[in-house]
């Protein structure tokens, strides 16, 4: 009972109900996490929350149910899954199991997302169904980070698709995170796990750069590389968006702690 606002935060419910989740998109990982969002339309704010009682007792990931997804939805949800995996891999709360799940998800997404968008078949749909599940397990274990914290504000203030916002923010958000030395090492390690042949003779910095470049190229290939201004984002709102980002729960998992000016700079660079 009560108002939906009563359930913002962590473990606010009093009891669990048996929940069976059947996914129809390949992106959110909601069938295997205890996370959910609440949108406060009055304040244009999106809250990330977690409650052990919302974790499904059974999850059904059947790629047959995803066969008719439109290309734009496939691209957006797929890039959301990629963001889950990359941010979980770099999370300060990650462990070995996080890294293994996230790396496997990233490999599958780079293999299957573009075909699933351009010429979907059973192989690409199944690959993305598995990838988003693994990514969900990864971020359910270690959380997300800066990119999700910024994305939440864009989708709340402007009612924009969450996955598209993640896709737009991921390259520049990742470059900002590289200011932390340990972050560069994490991006480099993920690059080596996903692109072992291509990155064989690269330095740590080159591997981190290469991974981010490949993310950007994938976003362009599936049609999610856009300017924020094209989507109605206003320059005069960037300060407010940065303030809201700093309050977002996902930011606590991030490997680098940006200040308001840095967050504004990222938004501005994408206008």
Describe the residue ranges of each PLM region.
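Short alpha-helical scaffolding segments that buttress acidic/His motifs in well-ordered protein cores
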Residues: 82-86, 128-136, 170, 215, ...
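A glycine/threonine-rich phosphate-anchoring loop and its flanking beta-alpha core
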Residues: 1-94, 185-189, 193
């Amino acid at each position: 009972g009560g108002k939906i606002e009563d359930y913002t935060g962590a473990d606010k419910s009093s009891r669990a109900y048996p929940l069976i989740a059947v996914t129809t998109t390949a992106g959110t990982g909601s069938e295997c996490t205890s996370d959910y969002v609440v949108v406060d339309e009055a304040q244009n704010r999106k809250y990330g929350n977690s409650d052990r009682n919302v974790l499904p007792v059974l999850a059904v990931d059947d790629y047959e149910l995803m066969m008719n997804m439109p290309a734009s939805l496939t691209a957006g949800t797929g890039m959301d899954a990629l963001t889950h995996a990359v941010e979980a891999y770099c999370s300060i709360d990650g462990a070995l199991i996080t890294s293994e799940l996230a790396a496997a998800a990233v490999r599958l997404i780079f293999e299957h997302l573009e075909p699933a968008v351009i010429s979907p078949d059973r192989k690409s749909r199944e690959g993305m169904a598995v990838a988003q599940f693994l990514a969900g397990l990864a971020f359910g274990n270690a959380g997300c980070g800066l990119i999700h914290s910024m994305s939440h504000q864009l989708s709340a203030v402007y009612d924009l698709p969450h996955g598209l916002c993640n896709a737009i923010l991921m390259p520049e958000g990742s470059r900002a995170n590289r200011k932390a030395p340990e972050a560069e090492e994490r991006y480099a390690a993920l690059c080596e796990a996903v692109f072992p042949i291509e990155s064989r003779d690269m330095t740590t910095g080159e591997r981190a750069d290469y991974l981010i470049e490949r993310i950007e190229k994938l976003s362009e290939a599936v049609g999610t590389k856009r300017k924020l201004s094209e989507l109605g984002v206003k320059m005069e709102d960037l300060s407010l968006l940065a303030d809201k980002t700093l309050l977002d729960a996902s930011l606590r998992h991030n490997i680098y702690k940006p200040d308001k000016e840095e967050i504004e700079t990222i938004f501005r660079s994408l206008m």
